[in-house]
């Protein structure tokens, strides 16, 4: 739109064509993630690394051990009922897993343990394993 060249390091979708009346680049699935659990969701409170996708109809999440959560966002908007291990949902879980795999590959996300990212990005941690914050 502004004729500025987008650097190769910029991640995400370019909606410029859509704004000009063209194709929508969105495939309907957004990545959700917790690269390293800390703060309000620290390990001591059950926090864990995860990657997932959210579509209009479903949310699917994996932790480092594998599939973890799957919700029907239309029937269960508060995500109270994990459908992952409910018989009959295997195909849906498999389809959502493939979308997640494709998204992670497209974003070069290796989905490694949180400590790898803490070291890579040189985050300082306090004694609780949380990035300190002061206002």
Regions found by a protein language model. Name each.
Residues 76:
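Intrinsically disordered, low-complexity polar regions and short flexible loop motifs
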Residues 30-33, 60, 70:
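Generic preference for hydrophobic
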Residues 41-45, 64-65, 72-73, 83:
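Short conserved micro-motifs at the rims of enzyme active sites and ligand-binding pockets
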Residues 83-135:
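Long, internal low-complexity/basic segments
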Residues 14-17, 79-83:
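Conserved beta-strand positions that form and line the central face of beta-propeller blades
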Residues 45-67:
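Low-complexity, glycine/alanine/valine/leucine- and proline-rich hydrophobic stretches
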Residues 1-49, 89-99, 112-118:
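Polar, surface-exposed loop/tail segments
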């Amino acid at each position: 739109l502004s004729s500025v060249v987008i650097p190769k390091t910029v991640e995400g979708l370019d909606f410029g064509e859509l704004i000009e009346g063209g194709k929508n680049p969105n495939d309907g699935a957004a990545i959700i993630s917790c690269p390293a659990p800390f703060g309000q969701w620290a390990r001591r409170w059950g926090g864990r690394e995860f990657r997932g996708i959210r579509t209009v109809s479903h949310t699917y999440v994996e932790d480092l051990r594998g599939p973890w959560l799957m919700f029907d966002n239309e029937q269960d908007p508060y995500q109270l009922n994990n459908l992952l291990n409910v018989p009959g949902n295997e195909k849906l879980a498999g389809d959502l897993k493939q979308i997640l795999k494709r998204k992670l590959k497209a974003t070069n996300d290796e989905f490694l343990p949180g400590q790898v990212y803490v070291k890579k990005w040189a985050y300082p941690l306090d004694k609780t394993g949380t990035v300190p914050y002061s206002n």
